[in-house]
């Protein structure tokens, strides 16, 4: 089940509400990534406390470990991981195509060697839909080929991007057919591909629109292309997506990317950046980024961001976070992750409020000025 209510707009920016089988998601929203069924360093309780409405799980990795038998014994991913709110699962396609020489692509699907134990495995649109049905995720993604930005060290040609996109379209129909055959009560999103070529993106969207997906994602961005190319494609595709369906930008990105995405008409985002950067001591704040390992923070008694209400900023100094990072304490990674995810989710809250009050352009200007100011 999916119901999307478009509450209001401000330019191309959209304030919406997505109702799914496990709850309501206020949009625009950021989805923390829980690759193996866990958002790294965070408990479900902590995710609730910082305002996460929905998290992302990885079909490919959960299929390999712990395996579908284990998840099925818990009647799905929600009970297995102790999370009672919505979950989106990707199709596994991106991970398979990231294996490079370890995989072989045909019209049927992808044959590859398991990165866990080397076993020969096969993943197809049908198998991806079956796995995601067992996981019982609220939002299922079609199986697609993520068109690479580079092939053999050069930009993908129009012909290469077209071939890849058209196979993804054929796989989209097979995904839709299998989703319906399984009588899956959840939602299925199609993925717009086409590389850096606007005409191919238009062709992809036209083909997907005929299949009547519950929502639409923009794939194949943030895969190594220059930022200006990413923004060019994003600003071309997002306003053309069906207005009455949710819009999801996959795997993006920085705080600046989220604001630009919302301005273009995107409702949903996911990225490992806030969690991965947190573990590496790279912290996002309203006034720019903090690299906590730097010696400048050794004796700094201030919080990361005095305007931030997260547990980390309310209780600990930059000096303590610097110390934890330098000595490799696990608590450092946890406190950093709490802060970064809180910052991302607070940013989304502020954008929702700005759109509601039709002052998104003012918000965007202030956001850019604050981030450019830098931390003192």
UniProtKB/Swiss-Prot annotation:
Single GO MF annotation: metal ion binding
Pathway(s) per entry: tRNA modification; tRNA-queuosine biosynthesis
Binding site for substrate: 90-94, 144, 193, 220
Requisite cofactors: Zn(2+)
Keywords annotated in UniProt: Glycosyltransferase, Metal-binding, Queuosine biosynthesis, Transferase, tRNA processing, Zinc
Pfam family, one: TGT
Segments of this protein annotated with the region RNA binding: 251-257, 275-279
GO biological process: queuosine biosynthetic process; tRNA wobble guanine modification; tRNA-guanine transglycosylation
Known catalytic reactions: 7-aminomethyl-7-carbaguanine + guanosine(34) in tRNA = 7-aminomethyl-7-carbaguanosine(34) in tRNA + guanine
Catalytic residues identified in the record: 90, 270
Record GO cellular component, one term: cytosol
Residue positions binding Zn(2+): 308, 310, 313, 339
Cofactor: binding details: Binds 1 zinc ion per subunit.
SUPFAM superfamilies the UniProt entry points to: tRNA-guanine transglycosylase (SSF51713)
Superkingdom field: Bacteria
EC number: 2.4.2.29
Family statement: Belongs to the queuine tRNA-ribosyltransferase family.
Role summary: Catalyzes the base-exchange of a guanine (G) residue with the queuine precursor 7-aminomethyl-7-deazaguanine (PreQ1) at position 34 (anticodon wobble position) in tRNAs with GU(N) anticodons (tRNA-Asp, -Asn, -His and -Tyr). Catalysis occurs through a double-displacement mechanism. The nucleophile active site attacks the C1' of nucleotide 34 to detach the guanine base from the RNA, forming a covalent enzyme-RNA intermediate. The proton acceptor active site deprotonates the incoming PreQ1, allowing a nucleophilic attack on the C1' of the ribose to form the product.
Quaternary structure (record): Homodimer. Within each dimer, one monomer is responsible for RNA recognition and catalysis, while the other monomer binds to the replacement base PreQ1.
The protein's name in its UniProt record: Queuine tRNA-ribosyltransferase
Organism: Cupriavidus necator (strain ATCC 17699 / DSM 428 / KCTC 22496 / NCIMB 10442 / H16 / Stanier 337) (Ralstonia eutropha)
